[in-house]
UniProtKB/Swiss-Prot annotation:
Name of the protein: Putative pyruvate, phosphate dikinase regulatory protein
Domain of life: Bacteria
Reaction(s) catalysed by this chain's protein: N(tele)-phospho-L-histidyl/L-threonyl-[pyruvate, phosphate dikinase] + ADP = N(tele)-phospho-L-histidyl/O-phospho-L-threonyl-[pyruvate, phosphate dikinase] + AMP + H(+); N(tele)-phospho-L-histidyl/O-phospho-L-threonyl-[pyruvate, phosphate dikinase] + phosphate + H(+) = N(tele)-phospho-L-histidyl/L-threonyl-[pyruvate, phosphate dikinase] + diphosphate
InterPro entries for the chain: Kinase-pyrophosphorylase, PPDK_reg, Ubiquitin-activating_enz
Keywords tagged on the record: Kinase, Nucleotide-binding, Serine/threonine-protein kinase, Transferase
Length: 272
């Protein structure tokens, strides 16, 4: 089955809990869609919307869809008008419901209501996932890794931590474990048997470039081994061998954004 790719832009003036939940429910009805979700939270100004539209425009040759839960009429109209101008499909979730209630009861909505106060079970689950992921970053606290939903393994600078945090915000408990080529893998792989374990890999030249930039940023250019092309190539090769030996899905992050990598991981998770 050929999957159609959809960039789904979820725009909210609060944390984004509502729009994420609605989008998640809707997407369950489409198995043939490969979705990359971009969550734009706490959008309060037109300038923020301009930046969102600028990012969407960069992918104008792809399928983009905007869903919003902005309650401010003026701001919501600004987003809608610009989406129409750019021919981007747009749907507001809450406005239609609020308008119908307002019309039926002949009352105006409370402009002072703040969606930041909306707290539900999903919110607390997300907080729990974020706390778990923070405490299981970079191989920490592996004694209770069995409580994770997803495990990421990869060499240094393959976006393990930011990907983990993005997934945590979506409600997944994620642990990430570093792979160091010169050191034997220290973890009992039997513990990963029933868990979704993903191997992250990357192009050698790209990783060398990233590591060199990292060394420059911390004023440690003298550490030539960390970014040595031959060493990096060997490290990636060993990591990929481990992934294949254990039949773990491998994702090449070279030309992918955090959102795209996360979308692929979520697809693997949903197949389990």
């Amino acid at each position: 089955m050929t999957l159609k790719k959809l960039n789904l832009h979820l725009v909210s003036d609060s944390s984004g809990e509502t729009v994420i939940s609605v989008a998640k429910s809707a997407l369950k009805h489409f198995r043939s869609i490969e979705t990359v979700e971009y969550v734009w939270s706490f959008v309060k100004e037109e300038e923020q919307i301009d930046k969102i539209l600028e990012e969407i425009n960069k992918k104008s040759n792809e399928h983009n869809f905007v869903i919003c839960t902005i309650t401010n009429d003026k701001l919501r109209k600004y987003l809608k008008d610009n989406c129409v101008k750019l021919k981007i499909p747009y749907r507001a979730i809450l406005s239609h419901i609020m308008r119908e209630i307002s019309s039926y009861l002949e009352i105006e909505k409370d402009e002072k209501f703040d969606l930041h106060t909306e707290i539900n079970n999903e919110y607390f689950q997300r907080i729990e996932a974020i706390n778990y992921t923070i405490n299981h970053d970079d191989g920490q606290n592996i004694q209770d890794i069995d409580k994770s939903d997803i495990i990421l393994i990869g060499v240094s600078r393959t976006s393990k931590s930011p990907t983990s945090m993005y997934l945590a915000y979506r409600g997944y408990k994620v642990a990430n474990i570093p792979f160091v080529g010169e050191i034997p893998f220290y973890f009992d792989l039997a513990k990963l048997k029933d868990k979704l374990t993903i191997g992250l890999t990357i192009d050698v030249n790209r990783l060398v470039e990233i590591r060199k930039n990292r060394l420059t940023s911390i004023n440690n250019e003298d550490n030539s081994i960390y970014a040595d092309p031959k060493k990096v190539e060997k490290e990636i090769k060993k990591a990929e061998e481990l992934f294949k030996q254990n039949n773990w899905p491998i994702i090449d992050v070279t030309q992918k954004s955090i959102e795209e990598v996360s979308a692929t991981i979520i697809q693997y998770f949903n197949r389990m």
